[in-house]
Amino acid sequence: MKLVKMSMALLLAAISFSGIQAQTADEIVNKYIDALGGKEKLQEVKTVYMENTSQAMGNEGPSTINLVTGVGFKIVSDFNGQSVIIAVTNKGGWQVNPFQGASAPTAMPEEMLKQSKGRLDPFGALNNYAAKGNKVELQGKDGNTFKLKVTNADSIETTIYVDATTYYITKVVSTAQMMGQTMEVTTTFSNYKKVDPAGVFFPYSYEISYGGQFSITTTVNKIEVNKTIDPTIFDMPKS
């Protein structure tokens, strides 16, 4: 009888702990949404246009981002007169990368597409995560940041670090397929600023490190919210 009571107590404790973990993860996500401007303001963001300056391997060049929420994302980066293009839509994706021998538009590999779908939301995987089929688990704290594991509908896992004071995302760790191999990609974010008249916050500085082999540092020079963007720019050009 004592064994049964002890087992029941352990079971109830486990259920209780699980509930606390889930509630805590949701609480962190909600505070992140509030830090960016609040749910209502984020929902009003239909498009985002950015002009940036990026540095990679001693080279510097401009880049632009066009995003229509839930529809398409496109980034064009220019280095040494060469353009690198990555485009993702809710139906597929394509890319141009002359530095990897792909000067003509090519369809994005399925695995890369699964990893890139999150770009269709300007506020990332935590925004409306349940509606997207994402699962969020709190994995504790790392210094002054909460560590969240996000698993999307395609079972792709990402680790997101949220500052415990500001509730901004400071780092995202994921994996990517590049040059025939899987490597860890770490993106760090900083210098969050308010974009008016939308009243939402975006990071104006970020660095992407590819497996420690090389990195791209980007400074955002301009952000426009709800600017008219022609969705046909996301279409893959015909050869």
Label every model-predicted segment:
Residues 27-101:
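N-terminal mature ectodomain segment of secretory-pathway/periplasmic proteins
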Residues 144-236:
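Gly/Pro-enriched, hydrophobic low-complexity segments
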Residues 8, 52, 176:
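Residues that line or immediately flank small-molecule/substrate-binding pockets and catalytic motifs
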Residues 65-72, 89-92, 110-112, 163-166, ...:
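A short, sequence-level motif marking secondary-structure junctions
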Residues 21-34, 95-156, 164, 176-183, ...:
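Flexible, processing/modification-adjacent segments and terminal tails
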Residues 45-47, 70, 131-133, 143-145, ...:
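Extracytoplasmic
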Residues 64-65, 83-85, 137, 157-161, ...:
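Short, surface-exposed charged micro-motifs
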Residues 1-25:
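Bacterial Sec-dependent N-terminal signal peptides
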